[in-house]
């Protein structure tokens, strides 16, 4: 007899209902819960799966390169990056009529195509790629790499190639290798690519496999390096009149500190970026030699942590016990990693537009808006995941004895103070911000806009002035030509930086006013409320006054039956579930703010944002409604245009989002009755009743239905805004 799915759980495999399928899928990756799982086997399976993950990423990036080389217009775009729209790939759709074929035939293509808004064209151009041939080579290389990684994943599941548990628990060696190898050497390699390939290409000198050993990246070669005259590599940088990709106005410097942006491409100087990556490489390669391994020199992580004890003795045991707690909990490690990566992802969103690293990215407005929105949403999901795994750590891995009196135990002991302070901050921000907005709406509605409460963000303006922004007239630090920092930086990076920060055409330190002050505090409300829900979920995951034995019920439970009132909605999973709604809400405000503010900057008129962003109707009418006008006319009784696919996707996103409520608002009894009725009808319908199944159909559990609802809500929400963002931006700027 064939073994039933899931093989990893005998109990589930023998379940006579459809619960077998849904719970099987839900727990397929929860390796800890599988039959016969040992700690060593757990680590080995996760380690092997990392290779599969990387293989998928390489396959995906290979596909991007391949489709652009095959169906894109990269070589044409390179000739005129500002006026030719980059093509992602062709569209073949039997539904297209002649009007659609004409509307979607763009960018010099011979048939319908999708326009790229991911920034890959700008990235490839900046790093020195110029031909389709090079894109194909990159694609094939990544495809081979994906195959190698799949093989490596399989290999590390074979008994003789499975690392031992002690190898996974060797924190110092792993830290050294990740610091020196992953960050250090890869940054050094990237510096090498920029210096040897990208910078020469930006000056009109092609470097390929045929000449890379003979073309010197710098006229003096390695002589300045070995003689200690490193400043030679910064001398004679590209001039302000340099034409990117040509020798006109080019210099010979390879590692500079110019500051600001290349006037033509509006991106950071390539030579500045090479210098940055070299510095990162040096720092991280040094850091990767700091921790003690078999050689007996360097720091011991355990000793560092155990030395961190508060001096007076009245603040507990400090960091004692943390080494083993972190090292023995995969959920703790994953929580830390997700928190870091989520924060970095949000920083990427902020820096991609304010300090654009890729040539001509700053002039491709739809791509800038897409990259910002994409990275902020990804960051939100990742950071929610950090708290989810933090909560699972508290439920499954936390040992009160091993952490007695240390900082972790003290956080749990003080959870009421932590949660109530977050609650107070959220309430304060919410009522005051909403109060200001609503007051402004009322006086607008009653015809006295001069009675609005408009608060200038003076502290933020003062900080901007300290960094060199002169428009506010503070005359302080870098905005004062006679201050010590201004005088110290004159010969280095300061002239370029000051020109950048005071330009009206880029997004470096935007000029801010009362509308910014209000939306900043609205976003602060969202961030603090999301954090409140997540922190409360994690700190109450083991138990609370209401339910002291909560940890015995696991990470996600619906409630403890009808006999124990008030135990619904208090599992750590429920906190994650609720927090995701707040996270989406907050990032909605963040992306609305970014987009509306930038539409004004890109169109050369910031008055609409400044005047309408101080009251709620301004946001609804002058941002959302006004910018959806082109979108909802993508197709109408008079025909269609190239925004029609986004108009349709806008509707489809709403549909997915709305479907979520069907799962969120109804509980399992309703579905069970419906399923039984459908099964009854199925059994009595000719032809249909030839199809039989053994499992008795049962409704999803409450927790599963919430997950399905949350997924629909999230996907629909993001998809709806994606369509709005791309259509409203590309509709204005082409």
From Swiss-Prot:
Record-annotated residues binding chlorophyll a B3?
Answer: 662, 670
Q: Top enzyme class of this protein?
A: oxidoreductase
Its Enzyme Commission number? 1.97.1.12
**InterPro entries, per the entry:** PSI_PsaA/B, PSI_PsaA/B_CS, PSI_PsaA/B_sf, PSI_PsaB
Question: Highest taxon of the source?
Answer: Eukaryota
Where [4Fe-4S] cluster binds, per the record, is at 559, 568
Give the reactions, separated by semicolons, that this protein catalyses.
Answer: reduced [plastocyanin] + hnu + oxidized [2Fe-2S]-[ferredoxin] = oxidized [plastocyanin] + reduced [2Fe-2S]-[ferredoxin]
Explain how, and how many, cofactor molecules are bound. Answer: P700 is a chlorophyll a/chlorophyll a' dimer, A0 is one or more chlorophyll a, A1 is one or both phylloquinones and FX is a shared 4Fe-4S iron-sulfur center.
Keywords, ordered alphabetically:
4Fe-4S, Chlorophyll, Chloroplast, Chromophore, Electron transport, Iron, Iron-sulfur, Magnesium, Membrane, Metal-binding, Oxidoreductase, Photosynthesis, Photosystem I, Plastid, Thylakoid, Transmembrane, Transmembrane helix, Transport
What topology in the membrane does the UniProt record assign?
Multi-pass membrane protein
Q: List the disulfide bonds.
A: none
Task: Using the record for this protein, list the coiled-coil segments as residue ranges, or answer none.
Answer: none
User: Where on this chain does phylloquinone bind?
Assistant: 671
Q: What is its main location?
A: plastid
Q: Report the transmembrane regions from the record.
A: 46-69, 135-158, 175-199, 273-291, 330-353, 369-395, 417-439, 517-535, 575-596, 643-665, 707-727
Give the GO cellular component terms, alphabetically.
chloroplast thylakoid membrane; photosystem I
Please, one GO biological process term?
Answer: photosynthesis
The places in or outside the cell where this protein is found are: Plastid, Chloroplast thylakoid membrane
Q: Which HAMAP family match?
A: PSI_PsaB
| Subunit comment | The PsaA/B heterodimer binds the P700 chlorophyll special pair and subsequent electron acceptors. PSI consists of a core antenna complex that captures photons, and an electron transfer chain that converts photonic excitation into a charge separation. The eukaryotic PSI reaction center is composed of at least 11 subunits.
Say what the protein does: PsaA and PsaB bind P700, the primary electron donor of photosystem I (PSI), as well as the electron acceptors A0, A1 and FX. PSI is a plastocyanin/cytochrome c6-ferredoxin oxidoreductase, converting photonic excitation into a charge separation, which transfers an electron from the donor P700 chlorophyll pair to the spectroscopically characterized acceptors A0, A1, FX, FA and FB in turn. Oxidized P700 is reduced on the lumenal side of the thylakoid membrane by plastocyanin or cytochrome c6.
The record ties this protein, via PANTHER family, to:
OUTER MEMBRANE PROTEIN, OMPA-RELATED, PHOTOSYSTEM I P700 CHLOROPHYLL A APOPROTEIN A1-RELATED
Q: Which family does it belong to?
A: Belongs to the PsaA/PsaB family.
What's the name of the protein?
Photosystem I P700 chlorophyll a apoprotein A2
| Organism listed in the record | Chlorella vulgaris (Green alga)
State the encoding gene: psaB
């Amino acid at each position: 007899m064939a073994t039933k799915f899931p093989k990893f759980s005998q109990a589930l495999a023998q379940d006579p209902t459809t619960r077998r399928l849904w719970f099987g899928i839900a727990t397929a990756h929860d390796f800890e819960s599988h039959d016969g799982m040992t700690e060593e086997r757990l680590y080995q399976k996760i380690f092997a799966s990392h290779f599969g993950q990387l293989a998928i990423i390489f396959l995906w990036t290979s596909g991007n390169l391949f489709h652009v080389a095959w169906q894109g217009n990269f070589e044409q775009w390179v000739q005129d990056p500002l006026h030719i729209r980059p093509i992602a790939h062709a569209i073949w759709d039997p539904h297209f009529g002649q009007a659609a074929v004409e509307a979607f035939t763009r960018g010099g293509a011979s048939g319908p195509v999708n326009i790229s808004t991911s920034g890959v064209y700008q990235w490839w151009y900046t790093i020195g790629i110029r031909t389709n041939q090079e894109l194909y080579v990159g694609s094939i290389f990544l495809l081979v790499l994906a195959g190698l990684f799949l093989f490596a994943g399989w290999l590390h599941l074979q008994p003789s190639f499975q690392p031992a548990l002690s190898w996974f628990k060797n924190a110092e060696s792993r830290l050294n290798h990740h610091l020196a190898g992953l960050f250090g050497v890869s940054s050094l390699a990237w510096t090498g690519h920029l210096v040897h390939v990208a910078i020469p290409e930006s000056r009109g000198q092609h470097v390929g496999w045929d000449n890379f050993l003979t073309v010197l990246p710098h006229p003096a070669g390695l002589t300045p390096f070995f003689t200690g005259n490193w400043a030679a590599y910064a001398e004679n940088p590209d001039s302000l009149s340099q034409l990117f990709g040509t020798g006109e106005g080019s210099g010979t410097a390879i590692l500079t500190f110019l500051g600001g942006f290349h006037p033509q491409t509006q991106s950071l100087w390539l030579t500045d970026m090479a210098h940055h990556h070299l510095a990162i490489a040096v720092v991280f390669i040094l850091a990767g030699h700091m921790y003690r391994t078999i050689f007996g020199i360097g720091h011991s992580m355990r000793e560092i942590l155990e030395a961190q004890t508060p001096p007076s003795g009245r603040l507990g045991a400090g960091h004692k016990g943390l080494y083993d707690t972190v090292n023995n909990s995969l959920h703790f490690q994953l929580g830390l990693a997700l928190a870091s990566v989520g924060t970095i992802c949000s920083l990427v969103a902020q820096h991609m537009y304010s300090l654009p690293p890729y040539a001509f990215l700053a002039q491709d407005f739809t791509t800038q808006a897409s990259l910002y929105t994409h990275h902020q949403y990804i960051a939100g999901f990742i950071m929610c995941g950090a708290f989810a795994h933090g909560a699972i750590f508290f439920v499954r891995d936390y040992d009160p004895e091993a952490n007695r009196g240390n900082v972790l135990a003290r956080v749990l002991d003080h959870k009421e103070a932590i949660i109530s302070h977050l609650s107070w901050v959220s309430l304060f921000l919410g009522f005051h911000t909403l109060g200001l907005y609503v007051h402004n709406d009322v006086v607008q509605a009653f015809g006295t806009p001069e009675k609005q409460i408009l608060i200038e963000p003076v502290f933020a303006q003062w900080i901007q002035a300290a960094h060199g922004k002169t428009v506010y007239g503070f005359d302080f630090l870098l905005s004062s030509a006679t201050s010590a920092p201004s005088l110290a930086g004159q010969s280095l990076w300061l002239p370029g930086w000051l020109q950048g920060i005071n330009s009206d055409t880029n997004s470096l330190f935007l000029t801010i006013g009362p509308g910014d002050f209000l939306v900043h505090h609205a976003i602060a409300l969202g961030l603090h409320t999301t954090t409140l829900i997540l922190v409360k979920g994690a700190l109450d995951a083991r138990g609370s006054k209401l339910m002291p034995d909560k940890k015995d019920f696991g990470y996600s439970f619906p409630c403890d039956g009808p006999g124990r009132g008030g135990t619904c909605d208090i599992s750590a999973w429920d906190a994650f579930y609720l927090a995701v709604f707040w996270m989406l809400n907050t990032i909605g405000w963040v992306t609305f703010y970014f987009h509306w503010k930038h539409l004004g900057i890109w169109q050369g008129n910031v008055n609409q944002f400044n005047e309408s962003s101080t009251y709620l109707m301004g946001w609804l009418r002058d941002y959302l409604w006004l910018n959806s006008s082109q979108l909802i006319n993508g197709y109408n009784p008079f025909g269609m245009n190239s925004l029609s696919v986004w108009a349709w996707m806008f509707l489809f996103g709403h549909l997915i989002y709305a479907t979520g409520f069907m799962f969120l608002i109804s509980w399992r009894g309703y579905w069970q009755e419906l399923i039984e009725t459908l099964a009854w009808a199925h059994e009595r319908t000719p032809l249909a009743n030839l199809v039989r199944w053994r499992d008795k159909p049962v409704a999803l559990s409450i927790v599963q239905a919430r997950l399905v609802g949350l997924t629909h809500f999230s996907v629909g929400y993001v998809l709806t805004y994606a369509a709005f963002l791309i259509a409203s931006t590309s509709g204005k700027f082409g």
